[in-house]
Amino acid sequence: MSRIAATFARLRDEGRAGLIPFVEAFDPDRETSATLLAGMAARGADLIEIGMPFTDPMADGPTIQQAGRRALRAGATLAGTLGLVRDFRAVNDTVPLILMGYLNPILSYGVERFTADAAAAGVDGVIVVDLPTEEADLLLPHLRQHRIDLIRLVAPTTTDERLPVVLNDSSGFVYYVSITGITGTRTASAEDLARDIPRVRKATDMPIAVGFGVRTPAQAATVARFADAAVVASALIDKLAAGLDADGKAPPAIVEAVLDDVAALAAAVRGERRAA
């Protein structure tokens, strides 16, 4: 059983949803992102998303765009991101890691090389935001060969007819984009989730994680009532960015504040029981 499957099986047994925080690799530097990765796992993250910095992150709002720019200035590369995963795996072999990003860096790195290196490093899944469903074969055979899940995005605008098509080649879990538009701009209501999550469940038996617009413990708790996991990204990056010093470095106090937020989010999702 994969780490992702084992984690969601455990969450089902515990009768609760999980927390998936996001960290941008190398934001604002390698050391800080490595500290955040380890700290998130220690503070209650059930899975962790790692952003692969890219020069043109079209689906991301200003927060993650700026994080990517900071990371690239710090020397972020795809090889460096895989190095972060490898270092994390040396001390934690249980928390699943999902790389999230765009197709171009993977193609530049080389698809077969990327999937082999990602598997060797300990990557469990990838979310490729701009990979069209009809072009999944660019990656899918290589990902399957190395037992890495291809996690697909679906949205409120994904029709009932389109859902099975998009999810046909997906594995691990479904990432439900709860809003239309770029990341971190607003949030879905309980009414939205109560309407939309059952519609997605009819199309798949995979777990459903909800992201794009989940910022607070209260919002994460709302997601936990309907979905299998809550994804929190922009709020954590905003907290980190607000505390950077004049040299763009992250003082220990702001790293600790971000991890305190992760702990609060984890407590919030643990306090909710899934709606029947």
From Swiss-Prot:
This is Tryptophan synthase alpha chain. Signal peptide: none annotated. Transmembrane segments: none annotated. It catalyses: (1S,2R)-1-C-(indol-3-yl)glycerol 3-phosphate + L-serine = D-glyceraldehyde 3-phosphate + L-tryptophan + H2O. The alpha subunit is responsible for the aldol cleavage of indoleglycerol phosphate to indole and glyceraldehyde 3-phosphate. Pathway: Amino-acid biosynthesis; L-tryptophan biosynthesis; L-tryptophan from chorismate: step 5/5. Tetramer of two alpha and two beta chains. Its EC number is 4.2.1.20. PANTHER family: TRYPTOPHAN SYNTHASE ALPHA CHAIN, CHLOROPLASTIC, TRYPTOPHAN SYNTHASE, ALPHA CHAIN. CDD domains: Tryptophan_synthase_alpha (cd04724). GO terms for molecular function: tryptophan synthase activity. The active site is at E49, D60. Pfam families: Trp_syntA. It is an enzyme of class 4 (lyase). Keywords: Amino-acid biosynthesis, Aromatic amino acid biosynthesis, Lyase, Tryptophan biosynthesis. Disulfide bonds: none annotated. GO terms for cellular component: cytosol. It comes from the Bacteria. Belongs to the TrpA family.
